[in-house]
Amino acid sequence: MPSHHLAEKMKNLNLPSPIQSITFQNQQFFLKRDDLIHPDFSGNKARKFYYFLQNDFPNITKIVSYGSAQSNAMYSLSVLAKMRGWGFEYFVDHIAEYLKENPHGNYRAAIENGMRLRQAQPPFLELVEGKNDILFIEEGGRQKEAEYGIKLLAQEIIDWQKDQDIKELNIFLPSGTGTTALFLQKNLLMLNAERLTLVFTTPCVGDKAYLQKQFLELESDEKYHPTILTLENKHHFGKLYKENYKIWLKLQQQTGVEFDLLYDPLGWRVLLAHPEVFSNPTLYIHQGGVLGNESMLARYERKYPSINLEL
């Protein structure tokens, strides 16, 4: 794609993303609407992949990545590739027959953007080694370049905090790989020494030990690590929990905002279970991902058809 088209697209990014005040379960929160950055390129993936949108890569002709066949990162990379005029190849170790035959959600949108899906077994890096025209992106965008866009997020929050004259701010966001939470805490501490801004998160994909390991892989100095909070019961990623569905519906009813169904319900359940966090003004980061709700919501509606009677 010619670069002037890219420049036009870039102008359309809604940055800094808006922050609004919401009330949920009789408690006031601030909400950072990263889901509104761009209709096709939003949330934490827009932050993680911002570096690849902003810089020149004259040798690159193709993006290669891997992960699940319904991932938000897969969809966002398909948009990035399309915006830059690159090919996009995505590896999965399995894909459900139902999804192949009935494409929907992130998978359908990525295919429509020109993604080529390939089945293979990890490690995937070996498949592209020695090819200098390929940009290889780790699963979920878990890499050092992600810090570039997340630093911008930190600066937006600092500017808003100063504008609102908030001395001590707590931030909450649910984590997959923990990349956003880690780089956010690190940059808030480095850029904003005179104010206390703490990042709290919860592991949605693995457990606390998994998340700590992810943090250490990206940053060895633990003073930059976010605070990890959890619920007492173990939570299995992607499993349908009635409590998750209920809180998601309540969020929509009380705030008018659609949240993601995979991460946000657990995020809000954990946050409400730790009221010590909102003893200070608390900012929740909406990280997008609502395109993936299509498949998840259908599963919830089939499993809990009379949920509204319980709200």
Regions found by a protein language model. Give the residues of each.
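PLP-dependent amino-acid enzyme catalytic core
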Residues: M1-L311
